[in-house]
């Protein structure tokens, strides 16, 4: 991906992605925690490990928290603050934080405010395994909405060691609803949301040919390896990590050429 370098990001990375027909995000959470806990037991002989000096317990079941619940637990927000756009804006002001421009370009967008505040205040506290569930529809254009509250979707992100390890959701398989979501994403992009999706006509057309109910998931193998190997940087677990050039023109500098050798030396004589 054409993104920056950090201890958790590398443009070239390894990911396990899969769809599971007739599954959903609840089932995938069960599968994911059993898979990773079993992996730990196979590699380490137990379901506990040390990562950056902290003991992590990978024994299932893992907690499942909404973004609002995480903000209340880890950042001290009240239930009233997490329930509305006005409350979230109040929380931004109290902490001297700027809300994302796309969230306040017009009428405040609850989902964008909620997710931005969660990323700012909660992610660093998520050391022990936890599923952050029911993401706002504004940031989850490919996920099914929750029938009990259409502001949210059947989506989770798994965090371990303060890092996002997996992302999954119940797939949206209605082509008409998906097309409407893409139109909403285009409006969000015009309002300044650089992460909003473009309209994918090919994907909508594929859904028109029918897709069964399904769950889809992506697991970051490099970050998971960081956890098991107790490494603080993704560079330590990638065979050929991309290096940041020391000078702006370094990437275009030709490799040094060897000095000219006598013919007898070049031939091994």
Residue ranges and their predicted role:
Residues 1-269:
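Class II aminoacyl-tRNA synthetase catalytic cores and aaRS-like
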């Amino acid at each position: 991906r054409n993104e920056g370098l950090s201890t958790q990001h590398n443009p070239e990375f390894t990911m396990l992605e899969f769809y599971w027909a007739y599954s959903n995000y609840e089932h995938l959470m069960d599968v994911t925690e059993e898979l990773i806990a079993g992996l730990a037991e196979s590699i380490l002989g137990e379901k506990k490990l040390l990562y950056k000096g902290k003991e992590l317990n990978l024994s299932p079941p893992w907690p499942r928290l909404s973004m609002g619940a995480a903000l209340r637990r880890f950042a001290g927000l009240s239930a009233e603050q997490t329930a509305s756009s006005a409350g979230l804006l109040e929380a931004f002001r109290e902490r001297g934080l700027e809300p994302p421009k796309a969230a306040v370009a017009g009428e405040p967008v609850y989902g964008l405010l909620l997710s931005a505040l969660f990323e700012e205040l909660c992610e660093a506290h998520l050391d022990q395994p936890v599923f952050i569930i029911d993401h706002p529809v504004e940031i989850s254009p490919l996920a099914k909405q929750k029938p009990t509250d259409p502001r949210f979707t059947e989506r989770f992100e798994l965090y371990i060691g303060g890092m996002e390890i997996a992302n999954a959701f119940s797939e949206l398989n209605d082509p008409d609803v998906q097309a409407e979501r893409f139109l909403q994403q285009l409006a969000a992009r015009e309002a300044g949301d650089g992460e909003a999706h473009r309209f994918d006509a090919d994907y909508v057309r594929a859904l028109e040919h029918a897709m069964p109910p399904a769950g889809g998931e992506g697991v970051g193998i490099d970050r998971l390896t960081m956890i098991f190997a107790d490494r603080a940087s993704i560079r330590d677990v990638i065979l050929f990590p991309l290096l940041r050039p020391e000078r702006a023109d370094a990437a275009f500098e030709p490799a040094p050429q060897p000095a000219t050798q006598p013919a007898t030396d070049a031939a091994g004589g």
